């Protein structure tokens, strides 16, 4: 009886603690990229998606733990999607890698990068990096073409089958992000956001539980499930945009988006905006996002990070 009474007291104390808003953080085995369960210790793979109109709809982008929207040549954007907790059966359409991808990947240990190809100069940089190249030249049996579309917008990857046999990609590590379902204090109500480039636009609307994302004014619907793209947290990360020595075969210059450094960051979660900062001191370190002089936690779930040019007086973005 004494043991039963003691257990009852402990249970009651737990209920009292919970009623006072104890942290509802990510599970101990959670992904360092989303806070979702099951990612700790598993491999991490970046998949390069095209993001022009002919590339869409995307396959299983909504299952990525985190994805970046990056400017490329001609004012277009591409998507660098990080998969860790789940490796869907099919992803894509896969497109070519860019120099900004390598700087993102330097914070991991032997991460995979799945992409359709790259020019000779960038291919040499990929081979010299610590990233594990998973292009069709490296893993040809897992790539195929969707014959209902034309190249280069139709190359798909059987990601889950590839990862079942993959031995070179390293396990994910902590990259500086924190997750908590409790809403931080000090936010300002925000129901919509947008960021734009000369030939591309991303926008979103708060839907009560997550953000609903559109590209070029059209709601994103998955090619497989038809589900909407609904990240829990959206970050507008203002980065240095530099000209690089890389470009496409048509003469377009590839911008280098510096994810190492520091700058402004607007974190959007739970229908609120937190105008703060980001810091990544070295290429090997992760990124810390802060608000009101403290690290800010993301909501548990998918994260979308949009690289915005921080070097112009009026960056093309809105938060309302």
Question: What positions do the PLM features span?
Answer:
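Bacterial N-terminal signal peptides that target proteins for export
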Residues: 1-10
């Amino acid at each position: 009886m004494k043991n039963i009474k003691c257990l009852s007291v402990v249970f009651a104390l737990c209920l009292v603690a919970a009623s006072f808003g104890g942290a509802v953080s990510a599970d101990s085995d959670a992904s360092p990229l989303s806070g979702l369960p099951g990612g700790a210790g598993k491999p991490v793979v970046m998949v390069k998606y095209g993001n022009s109109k002919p590339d869409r709809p995307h396959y299983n982008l909504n299952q990525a733990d985190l994805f970046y929207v990056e400017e490329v040549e001609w004012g277009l954007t591409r998507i660098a999607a990080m998969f860790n907790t789940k490796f869907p059966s099919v992803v894509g359409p896969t497109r070519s890698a860019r120099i900004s991808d390598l700087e993102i990947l330097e914070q991991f240990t032997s991460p995979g990068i799945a992409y359709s190809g790259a020019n000779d100069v960038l291919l040499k940089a990929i081979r010299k990096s610590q990233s594990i190249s998973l292009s069709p030249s490296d893993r040809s049996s897992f790539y195929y073409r969707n014959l209902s579309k034309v190249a280069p917008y139709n190359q798909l990857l059987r990601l889950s089958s590839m990862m079942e046999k993959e031995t070179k990609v390293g396990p994910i590590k902590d990259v500086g992000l924190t997750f908590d379902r409790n809403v931080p204090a000090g936010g300002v109500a925000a129901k919509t956001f947008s960021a734009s480039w000369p030939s591309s636009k991303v926008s979103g609307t708060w839907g009560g539980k997550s953000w609903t994302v559109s590209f070029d004014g059209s709601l994103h619907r998955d090619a497989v499930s038809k589900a909407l793209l609904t990240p829990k947290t959206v970050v507008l990360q203002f980065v240095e945009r530099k000209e690089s020595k890389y470009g496409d075969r048509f003469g377009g210059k590839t911008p280098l988006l510096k994810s190492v450094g520091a700058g402004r960051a607007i974190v959007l979660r739970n229908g609120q905006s937190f105008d703060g900062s980001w810091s990544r001191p070295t290429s090997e370190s992760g990124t810390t996002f802060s608000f009101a002089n403290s690290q800010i936690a993301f909501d548990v779930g998918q994260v979308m990070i949009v690289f915005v040019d921080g070097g112009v007086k009026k960056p093309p973005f809105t938060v309302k």
